[in-house]
From Swiss-Prot:
Residues reported in the UniProt entry to bind ATP: G374, H375, T376, G377, S378, G379, K380, S381
Name of the protein: Putative ABC transporter ATP-binding protein exp8
Listed PANTHER family: ATP-BINDING CASSETTE SUB-FAMILY B MEMBER 10, MITOCHONDRIAL, ATP-DEPENDENT PERMEASE MDL1, MITOCHONDRIAL
Source organism (scientific name): Streptococcus pneumoniae serotype 4 (strain ATCC BAA-334 / TIGR4)
Transmembrane segments: 26-46, 61-81, 135-155, 159-179, 259-279
Length: 583
């Protein structure tokens, strides 16, 4: 829970985003100040009219009335411009905060995403930033306007009659006590409400992502119950927040204002005429009480939103300040030449406690293909994670062209490694943009890459060809078509190293022959590392490494490993037997 000091820290940091918009903010504040000055003058004009002209209407009285209504019109126009300027500042600040949060998120390492639900991140970048926007566009201007109005009104009241002003000021300590009490009680409830909203987003994202599995295994009722539980808890805390607002805000503040009226009227009735207080002055004071209390009522009504904004800003800043980055590179000056890879006694653990890779050593050169096989959890994909620098290894060396992998920049490393995953990921856009990945790739290069992997044939059959739209995750294409597009994307980037992470695992046997032909062409002249479930797809590898519990237990060609009669032989025999049973 945020304490008072943390809230001030968050608020000061939010205010720092105002710096680039200093002139715009100054103009907005100027218009707000002008609005409050006009509001303060209007009751004086009314008071003067009541005392001087109400019983003696003449041409000058008409002029005073015109001034009175003209001030109201001017106040409306000036207030509109001020609010408009504040809204522009608000949206600009939220844009900057989202930009900073997204930029930092893009640099975070895989370990952060392993432990943070996607829905929680989305909630911070959308819901929480929208709450911050509400604070700047409405609440902040209300707070500043309230301060201006309070000070100008108080000054005008003191000039008009200090005795009546002293009576009104007796209520101020009660107001500040009320606001402080509300602040203390509301913070915890608001933080819990925002946290539960984040949980709802996470649960929604998880269910949408896994809807096929949920329906296939009849998990709808169980997950509905889990969602209802979180949703109900959110409702409970939301109702608590509303109840707190209803108790401490308008009813309490309105009661204080009515008490102020009562005290003022009683004092006027008891001593008003004897000490020379005019009806016009009394009218002006009633108006000033409204102007004194109404901004305070508005501020207290917006206080819950301010508290919510403080909590939301704290969550967004936590994302901006997150430093679980990808492994750091050293000087980053090295360039990939051939793409020769060597692991020397590499050990790796995701949590620093449980080893995933234990003393891994192997090498592969340009034009060669090696493969890693093993049961689930044996460490196959972890080797790729280490090579791609998604995670930092604890000991050993990883060399690329005999240069420590840390001496390459992330950009140099990633642009020379083509990664093809088991589940090809396509972005919302077009086929052309998915192959080019928004790089400076010509249409001819895109088409050549597609033709190289035999994807051109089905693309040309589409009504819009390479400009055909791609829906989210490419759901309108078959698995084989999505994989061919992923191959074309890799070829278009012209990498020196090719990594195939079970690239054919989800493809049917009929499509596999086409995909394998494309893979064979892609591997030519490149350093290739393949992770395979189907052993039939890696029989032509120069060397096959068998992993078990993070260690290499066997290595050799397909024929050598079969002759060895070990783990690989058993795995191959099981797959061959399963294949025979299906025929």
């Amino acid at each position: 829970m945020q304490n008072k000091q943390e809230q001030w820290t968050v608020l000061k940091r939010l205010m720092s985003y105002l710096k680039p918009y200093g002139l715009l903010t100054f103009l907005a504040l100027s218009f707000l100040l002008a609005t409050t000055v006009i509001k303060s003058v209007i009751p004086l004009v009314a008071s003067h009219f009541i005392d001087q002209y109400l019983s003696n209407l003449n041409q000058l009285a008409v002029t005073v009335l015109l001034v009175y209504y003209g001030l109201y019109i001017l106040q409306t126009v000036v207030q509109y411009v001020g609010n408009l300027l504040f809204a522009r500042v608000s949206y600009s600040i939220v844009r900057d905060i989202r930009r900073d949060a997204f930029a930092n998120m893009e640099k975070l390492g895989m370990s952060y995403f392993d432990k943070t639900p996607a829905g929680s991140i989305v909630s911070r970048l959308t819901n929480d930033t929208e709450t911050i926007s509400d604070m700047f566009s409405g609440i902040l201007s209300s707070f500043i306007s309230a301060v201006f109005i309070f000070l100008t009104t108080l000054y005008t009241m003191l000039v008009l009659d200090f005795r009546l002003t002293a009576l009104v000021l007796l209520f101020l300590p009660l107001i500040f006590l009320l606001v402080n009490l509300y602040r203390k009680k509301s913070v915890k409830i608001i933080e819990k409400t925002r946290s539960l909203l984040s949980d709802i987003n996470s649960k929604l994202a998880e269910n949408i992502e896994g809807i096929r599995i949920i329906q296939a295994f009849n998990q709808e009722k169980r997950l509905q119950a889990e969602f209802d539980e979180i949703n109900q808890e959110h409702l409970v805390y939301a109702n608590r927040s509303v109840a707190l607002d209803a108790l401490f805000l308008r009813p309490a503040m309105s009661l204080l204002k009515l008490l102020g009226y009562a005290v003022l009227m009683a004092y006027f009735g008891y001593r008003g005429f004897s000490i020379g207080i005019t009806v016009g002055t009394m009218y002006a004071f009633i108006q000033y009480i409204n102007r004194l209390f109404d901004p305070l009522i508005e501020v207290t009504q917006n206080f819950s939103t301010l508290q919510t904004a403080m909590v939301s800003a704290g969550r967004v800043f936590a994302l901006i300040d997150e430093r679980t980055y990808e492994p750091l590179q050293e000087n980053g000056q090295a360039k990939v030449q051939e793409g020769n890879i060597r692991f020397e006694h590499v050990c790796f653990s995701y949590d620093g406690k449980h080893p995933i890779l234990d003393d891994i050593s192997f090498s592969v050169n340009k034009g060669e293909t090696i493969a890693f096989v093993g049961h689930t959890g044996s460490g196959k994909s972890s080797i790729i994670n280490v090579l791609m620098r998604f995670y930092e290894f604890q000991s050993g060396r990883v060399l690329l062209d005999d240069v420590d992998i840390r001496d390459f920049s992330q950009e140099e490393l990633r642009k020379n490694i083509g990664l093809v995953l088991q589940e090809p990921f396509l972005y919302h856009g077009t086929i052309k943009s998915n192959i080019a990945m928004y790089q400076e790739t010509s249409d001819e290069q895109v088409q050549a890459a597609a033709a190289f992997v035999d994807a051109d044939s089905f693309i040309q059959e589409l009504p819009q060809g390479y400009d055909s739209p791609v829906s989210e995750r490419g759901s309108s294409f078959s698995t084989g078509q999505r994989q061919l597009l992923a191959f074309a994307r890799t070829v278009a980037s012209q990498p020196k190293i090719l990594i195939l992470d079970e690239a054919t695992a989800n493809i049917d046997s009929e499509t596999e022959s086409l995909v394998q032909a494309s893979l064979a062409k892609m591997r030519q002249g490149r350093t290739t590392i393949a992770i395979a479930h189907r052993l039939s797809t890696i029989q032509d590898a120069n060397c096959i490494y068998v992993l078990d519990k993070g260690r290499i237990i066997e290595s050799g060609t397909h024929e050598e490993l079969l002759a060895l009669g070990g783990t690989y032989h058993k795995m191959y025999s099981l797959q061959a037997g399963a294949m025979a049973d299906t025929l």
